[in-house]
């Protein structure tokens, strides 16, 4: 028999509140949290995976607030770009991708070359070497012979003088596959500027198109020459690899280019130099080239070029399903996490759904939040308590454990989680008076790990599990299974007796007797 539901149902997200070993560096176990511990002792609870493959990230990668809220709100694993592309390589769909295959075939049909340009490192922030190697495989499968790599050097997400090793790896891969050669190298300072320093982008573009730059007979020679001038990877000036005194390859009419960076912000300027018709940031040698240019992901909606992996459109996310049931909902957070309970929770959609109200509580104006660990948690609490009776569903975020956790100040993090616990107590009491259900969870870990093994401050997120507590007297005897963030939305719908849409692949955490 279905359990009657009193309104509102509240989903409370404690940002950066993970489950870690008790110890001196764990602000959560060190803090006085009587309300949180009382809920753990008295109500059904479980643990959720909030990092790595469970939230669409590479295995072992820590979670974050954007990804956490995206998965919670979507009710399914939302694969991030890096993971989506790597998954496509594994399942083979990469090699039938229309945009990528189209670029390779266009080069073949026009008697042109394929140019693969992007960041060559294993930093995993902007690009991935596996994606470059898969593009080489695709070109070989399609029978293309002339394939050239334009290697942008990192030195930021990896050590500052590590490029030689990555270039050797790429050259080894080219030899093993029997396809591809490095034609230019340059630091990301030039090729990946995002601050409208167009003179930098111009130097990168002219090296790629006109062969302008330092000359070297091999990538290793170019790197050596740069290091001798005390210029490390990020700042390596554009260098052109030559054969018999001429550039090995430049981008020409009839060629195809694939920009294999998956992160958008630092790929936009160079892309615009290639594809924009009314480009006026600098003079392009020979004007706009007639080439096939493909972006690996969508760098900007206004860029006129094919995209191999366009943004995912998430249908039937939790907010949409709640709206479709005719229910009123509230999203409330302070400034630091407002986008997370709105844009990210709604699957990357800016517009509210019908019946969805949003309330932003300003975050305090301090340089760092260890100066005010309470942040605006009490103000968020005051505001939500005033509005409990106006809504059917409320999503609330407390930012403190994450934002104060990032400062590395253990005492401040303890004060932060103690403030949140005080607020939990006030909200739980008000919800209990209404016999309304409260679901308490987190998006990723942070405050439970404030010390490195050597005693230094730890300021990053963690890969730890996060709590999930079902606070409702009618479910006191219920059992909950372990799961992942994708299972939160189906649990909300289960309690509200709303049909779970097929697009949600998560499952309710409530074990059916």
From Swiss-Prot:
Swiss-Prot/TrEMBL cofactor(s): Mn(2+)
Pathway: Carbohydrate degradation; glycolysis; pyruvate from D-glyceraldehyde 3-phosphate: step 3/5
GO biological process: glucose catabolic process; glycolytic process
Active site: 65
Top-level EC class: isomerase
UniProt remark on cofactor binding: Binds 2 manganese ions per subunit.
Residues holding Mn(2+) 1: 402, 406, 461
Keywords for this protein: Glycolysis, Isomerase, Manganese, Metal-binding
Reaction(s) catalysed (UniProt annotation): (2R)-2-phosphoglycerate = (2R)-3-phosphoglycerate
Purpose: Catalyzes the interconversion of 2-phosphoglycerate and 3-phosphoglycerate.
Subunit structure: Monomer.
Family recorded in the similarity comment: Belongs to the BPG-independent phosphoglycerate mutase family.
HAMAP family documented for this protein: GpmI
NCBIfam families in the record: pgm_bpd_ind (TIGR01307)
PANTHER family per record: 2,3-BISPHOSPHOGLYCERATE-INDEPENDENT PHOSPHOGLYCERATE MUTASE
Protein name (Swiss-Prot/TrEMBL): 2,3-bisphosphoglycerate-independent phosphoglycerate mutase
Organism this protein belongs to: Moorella thermoacetica (strain ATCC 39073 / JCM 9320)
